[in-house]
Amino acid sequence: MNHIVANKIQQILGYTFTHQELLKQALTHRSASSKHNERLEFLGDSILSFVIANALYQHFPYIDEGDMSRMRATLVRGNTLAEIAYEFDLGEYLQLGQGELKSGGFRRESILANTVEALIGSIYLDSNIKTVEELILKWYEKRLEKISPGDTQKDPKTRLQEYLQSKHLSLPSYFIVEVYGEAHNQLFTIHCEVSTLSTSFIGKGTSRRKAEQDAARKALIKLGVE
């Protein structure tokens, strides 16, 4: 990784590494090198779970353990981490083996989610728990502001359907527009049409379901529900 690329990704992350080799390792998939990011991912997963659990405990003093567990699961699950990775354009910085590169690993949700966890682990090792906690809370600031006990744990398709039903409006329609890639590594493009809105919403994902959820999420934002 050259100096310019390293500086760019650190600017995006909001953190400058003292030990640059930790950044490189966090971005290295096992297909590219024996010095890959899986151990960092293991560490980052535990740190993320703790930081989010503590944030929920502090922000919601009157809710029970069950609600906190569901909210934490929503915030640390793979697709949420992948969303953060997309926001950071992490796919551009991944070190992948030729096989993974050709099969589109740079956009695979699981690889992106694991990389976010690995970065958390690497930042902790490069600094301390206080620094990485502050950074995670910055990354999650808007998500922590929006989340609340109850129906926010439902997926976007369900929330969109329930919202439209509550307004006595027609249910949304989903159409496959494109399927790209080989059978084991496909990227789906879906259009979601809502009768009350003049535009359709494009969703993408590694499965039809994920693409539909992505499109529904965009419709909810347009409707002002999220």
From Swiss-Prot:
Digests double-stranded RNA. Involved in the processing of primary rRNA transcript to yield the immediate precursors to the large and small rRNAs (23S and 16S). Processes some mRNAs, and tRNAs when they are encoded in the rRNA operon. Processes pre-crRNA and tracrRNA of type II CRISPR loci if present in the organism. Keywords: Cytoplasm, Endonuclease, Hydrolase, Magnesium, Metal-binding, mRNA processing, Nuclease, RNA-binding, rRNA processing, rRNA-binding, tRNA processing. This is Ribonuclease 3. InterPro entries: dsRBD_dom, RNase_III, RNase_III_dom, RNase_III_sf. SUPFAM superfamilies: dsRNA-binding domain-like, RNase III domain-like. Belongs to the ribonuclease III family. GO terms for cellular component: cytoplasm. CDD domains: DSRM_RNAse_III_family (cd10845), RIBOc (cd00593). Mg(2+) binds at E41, N114, E117. One of its GO terms (molecular function) is rRNA binding. It is an enzyme of class 3 (hydrolase). Its cofactor is Mg(2+). The lineage of its organism: Bacteria, Pseudomonadati, Pseudomonadota, Gammaproteobacteria, Enterobacterales. Its EC number is 3.1.26.3. It is found in: Cytoplasm. Residues 155-225 form the DRBM domain.
